[in-house]
């Protein structure tokens, strides 16, 4: 009874969670009955702890509603259920265009070593400085880091391919190298390759020129893990897409891990064949968003600590509130502050930072104003600027207005009452409600999440 109800339980979870959350945390689970106990198997400790902390109450509540006092005890365990017993997986409830295997086969990491192309070493370009330990986690990148950690622990498993997308300088490349370092740590003989998509194109062109295309194919199809950054640069390169299509298929058929990154959601990449874009979404697709204020502060504090600099909290918040677009911009600004402090011997204060970053701060303040946000959002949603300030409450107008209010709260230093005044004299509680509503919708709606990220990129560029 409890095992059969598990299907209904995961259906409820699928309704309540985002597609990313369901695919990452619920989909890998397996269950079986042991006496009056329902054992929930997670693939690793990370998933087990997350599900128990975040979703145990929902699961308990469901079984209590359905079975009352007969509800089973719940126990979590790591691994798979004994193979001789019946199995129910969460994959039964998820809708996917790709058939999902009942059994995950880990790559053997024993593939014969192919002849290298252009004297390339299989993993010479995995940067050992990029680790999970020095990746600053926040709400904006939490899912991406969690997925990457699971891939590092179980390459070729549930999240294959893993597709990370988001603007430049948000940490996608850091995560690729961290996964590579994790795989190599667990499997020193693993053949892990990281590269920019242009390198793949260059290798293919060189192979064609040297009549070595078969060696090229053997090399790329022999790796245990292939990580390609900025896959959007394959756009309009038909021969490269053709070769990558077959490489992709060969690696997935062998349960070898693929991770791709892009600045866009897979289906939005122009100039790439539909059959490739479809395959990009076969595994797990995760957005990496611009870091929120707390994460930006943490990044600055971590970077300062690594540089041996004592950065006052108020200075970190001052910089983080004004530079919002990406991690590289933050680190570049901090490097400039540190260099100026070392050169002048002056203490790092807010006034000192104002002086050291005066051109950068002036540019940011000039670019991001409430008026600019309103115009950008109105143009994006194809509504009139007058509607943004009007009392109209139709969803086609109210939702863009709420988005603009939330962006104004995040991207400017204006107070809630000041933002309300700029939106037709609205009360600060209206602005607060809009901010909370958009935050909720960004968790629940892929479209709103994409719109918000696109607008931040536009306003911060």
From Swiss-Prot:
Gene Ontology terms, MF aspect: ATP binding; ATP hydrolysis activity; DNA replication origin binding; lipid binding
Its job: Plays an essential role in the initiation and regulation of chromosomal replication. ATP-DnaA binds to the origin of replication (oriC) to initiate formation of the DNA replication initiation complex once per cell cycle. Binds the DnaA box (a 9 base pair repeat at the origin) and separates the double-stranded (ds)DNA. Forms a right-handed helical filament on oriC DNA; dsDNA binds to the exterior of the filament while single-stranded (ss)DNA is stabiized in the filament's interior.
Gene Ontology cellular-component terms listed: cytoplasm; plasma membrane
Pfam short name (any one): Bac_DnaA_C
Subunit record text: Oligomerizes as a right-handed, spiral filament on DNA at oriC.
Family to which the UniProt record says this protein belongs: Belongs to the DnaA family.
Ligand binding (ATP): 169, 171-173
Region annotated Domain IV, binds dsDNA, chain positions: 342-461
Region described as Domain III, AAA+ region: spans on this chain: 125-341
Positions of region (Domain I, interacts with DnaA modulators): 1-87
Biological process according to GO: DNA replication initiation; regulation of DNA replication
Transmembrane segments: none
Keywords, ordered alphabetically: ATP-binding, Cytoplasm, DNA replication, DNA-binding, Lipid-binding, Nucleotide-binding
Chief localization: cytoplasm
Subcellular location field: Cytoplasm
Name of protein: Chromosomal replication initiator protein DnaA
Chain segments carrying region Domain II: 87-124
The record's note on its domains: Domain I is involved in oligomerization and binding regulators, domain II is flexibile and of varying length in different bacteria, domain III forms the AAA+ region, while domain IV binds dsDNA.
InterPro entries in the cross-refs: AAA+_ATPase, Chromosome_initiator_DnaA, Chromosome_initiator_DnaA-like, Chromosome_initiator_DnaA_CS, DnaA_C, DnaA_dom, DnaA_N_dom, DnaA_N_sf
């Amino acid at each position: 009874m409890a095992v059969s109800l598990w299907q209904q339980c995961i259906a409820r979870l699928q309704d309540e969670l985002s597609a990313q959350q369901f695919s990452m945390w619920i989909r890998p689970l397996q269950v079986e009955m042991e006496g009056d106990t329902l054992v929930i198997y997670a693939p690793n400790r990370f998933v087990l702890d997350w599900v128990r902390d975040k979703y145990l109450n929902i699961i308990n509540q469901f079984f209590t509603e359905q079975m009352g006092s007969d509800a089973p005890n719940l126990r979590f365990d790591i691994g798979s259920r004994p193979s001789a017993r019946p199995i129910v997986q969460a994959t039964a409830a998820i809708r996917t265009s790709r058939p999902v295997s009942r059994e995950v086969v880990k790559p053997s990491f024993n593939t014969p070593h192919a002849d290298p192309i252009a004297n390339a070493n299989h993993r010479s370009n995995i940067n050992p400085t990029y680790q999970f330990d020095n990746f600053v986690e926040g709400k904006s990148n939490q899912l991406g880091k969690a997925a990457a950690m699971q891939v590092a622990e179980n390459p070729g498993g549930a999240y294959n391919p893993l597709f990370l997308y988001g603007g430049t300088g948000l940490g996608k490349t850091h995560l690729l190298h961290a996964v590579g370092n994790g795989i190599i740590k667990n499997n020193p003989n693993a053949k892990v390759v990281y590269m920019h998509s242009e390198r793949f194109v260059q290798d293919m062109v060189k192979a064609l020129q040297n009549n070595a295309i078969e060696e090229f194919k053997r090399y790329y199809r022999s790796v245990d893990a292939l990580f390609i950054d900025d896959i959007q640069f394959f756009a309009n390169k038909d021969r490269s897409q053709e070769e990558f299509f077959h490489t992709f298929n060969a690696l997935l058929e062998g349960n070898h891990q693929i991770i791709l990154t892009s600045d866009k959601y897979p289906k939005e990449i122009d100039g790439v064949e539909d059959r490739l874009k479809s395959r990009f979404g076969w595994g797990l697709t995760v957005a990496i968003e611009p870091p929120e204020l707390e994460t930006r502060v943490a990044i600055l504090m971590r970077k300062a600590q690594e540089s041996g600099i004592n950065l006052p909290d108020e200075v970190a918040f001052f910089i983080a509130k004004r530079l919002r677009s990406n991690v590289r911009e933050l680190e570049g600004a901090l490097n400039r502050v540190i260099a100026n402090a070392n050169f002048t011997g002056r203490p790092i204060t807010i006034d000192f930072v104002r002086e050291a970053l005066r051109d950068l701060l002036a540019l940011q303040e000039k670019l991001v104003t409430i008026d600019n946000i309103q115009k950008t959002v109105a143009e994006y949603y194809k509504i009139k600027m007058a509607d943004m300030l009007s009392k109209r409450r139709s969803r086609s107008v109210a939702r863009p207005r709420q988005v603009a209010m939330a962006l104004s709260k995040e991207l400017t230093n204006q107070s809630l009452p000041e933002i309300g005044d700029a939106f037709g004299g609205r009360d600060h509680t209206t602005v607060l409600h809009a901010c909370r509503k958009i935050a909720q919708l960004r968790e629940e709606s892929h479209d709103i999440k994409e719109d918000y990220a696109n607008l931040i990129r536009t306003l911060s560029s």
